[in-house]
């Protein structure tokens, strides 16, 4: 008489490699998820907005209280901004559009998702943002805008929703930007500055 022998297979052991990979993928998912959610929120700002298309960019004037920003070829502003301030704000954001800063920002956000554990990536992202803002400020002042009026306009634009993935006005950069403008320091092209940060990320 034959008897069947039941052999139980041991459950695979949890290895350090598996744990590290799981944690890494969770981090990638969280950072990428935040980026995608920001894109969704940006798209929603078009609802009920007055949209004006030009050869250089699309101006989206939304009833929602936001801090002005640009995302690729679209410039988003609050529709209650005074006309005297709107021109300088649009000039600033149009500079971001012309220099394709959004493409740089998206590339950096993807790098942050892939290398979220590396603090130098987050530092490089901050430096890139600074370089882009300095470059846009330099372009606006080169067009002949009054520096004092422009600085006041920037200060009044600090409040409201402004996604990290987009190019916008942020409080943390205000003092540095004001100092840069008053010393008339010229910024180099932001792509070159970004390339200079890459060796620190490897």
Please report, for each region that a protein language model flagged, where it lies by residue.
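Membrane-embedded and juxtamembrane structural elements of multi-pass membrane proteins
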Residues: 1-202
């Amino acid at each position: 008489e034959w008897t069947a022998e039941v052999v139980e297979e041991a459950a695979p052991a949890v290895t350090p490699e598996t744990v590290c990979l799981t944690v890494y993928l969770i981090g990638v998912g969280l950072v990428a998820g935040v980026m995608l959610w920001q894109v969704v929120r940006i798209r929603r700002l078009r609802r009920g907005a007055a949209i004006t298309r030009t050869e250089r960019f699309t101006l989206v004037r939304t009833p929602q209280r936001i801090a002005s920003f640009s995302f690729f070829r679209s410039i988003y502003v609050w529709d209650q901004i005074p006309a005297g301030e709107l021109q300088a704000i649009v000039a600033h954001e149009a500079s971001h559009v012309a220099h394709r800063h959004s493409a740089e920002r998206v590339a950096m956000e993807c790098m942050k998702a892939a290398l979220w554990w590396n603090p130098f990536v987050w530092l490089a992202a901050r430096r890139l943002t600074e370089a882009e803002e300095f470059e846009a400020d330099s372009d606006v002042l080169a067009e002949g805008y009054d520096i004092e009026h422009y600085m006041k306009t920037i200060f009044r634009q600090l409040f409201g929703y402004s996604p990290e993935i987009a190019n916008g006005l942020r409080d943390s950069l205000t003092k540095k930007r004001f100092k840069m403008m008053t010393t008339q320091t010229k910024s180099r092209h932001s792509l070159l500055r970004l390339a200079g940060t890459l060796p620190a990320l490897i």
